[in-house]
Amino acid sequence: STTVNARLSTDNVNFKGDSSADVGVEMLNVNHDFGAVDVTLGRYGMTLGNQGGWLYNSSYGFDGAQLAADFGKVNVAVGYGQFNSARNTQFDITDCDDPANKGAFIDNHDTFYAKANADLGAFDLYANYYTNMESKAQLDYDIWGVGLVIPVSQFRVFGEYWQDTTFKGEDDAWNAGIGYGMKDLKKPGTWSLDVAYNNVGEGVYLGG
């Protein structure tokens, strides 16, 4: 099956008045499902990190193509394109002239990524890899991360580790936490609560 997904956005509009505002399409993509494999083309969401995407989270943050495969307890995805809103908020644009700050800005540069997650029964394991494909030293980045979730009855213990191998200095980030409950947006009244400690180096943070 093939689906087209789009979302319109606009400035503040009062439908009872005579004011006007610009309307735009902030997310638009086409997805085709081949069964265990599906392909997505266009502008789609991207999430990096647990806790809802602490490293990076945008429902329209990537322009490109993705191939994903579902093997039951193991899922993998690879993609190519460009971030359109990924910026490390610790830096100004002039900082990119300093090789020590490479990786600070990753938007609008060709990017390859690969993601995988596995349900191993006693725990869930996942890994992510993102790399810049333009070979520009001042904008180069090479980010990888691994994470673990261990369910214990209604509780869960989780943690992550990330590193930007091209950054000098504070190039990594990690967290550990505990959660309770299971939120399901299709079931009113369900909820979840997570508490975590995050240690984030400036070289790996993307403004999530």
Predicted regions and their residues:
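Intrinsic disorder/low-complexity signal
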Residues: T94-D97, G159, L193
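Loop-centered beta-sheet repeat module
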Residues: I93-D140
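Oxyanion-binding "anion nests"
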Residues: Y141-Y180
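Short secondary-structure boundary segments
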Residues: S20-E26, N57, Y126-P151
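Outer membrane beta-barrel
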Residues: S1-D92, D110-Y126, D171-G207
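Short, catalytically relevant binding-site loops at active-site mouths
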Residues: N132-E134, Q163-F167, G201-E202
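Active-site proximal loops enriched in glycine and acidic residues that flank catalytic Cys/His/Asp
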Residues: Y129, G159-Q163, Y197-N199
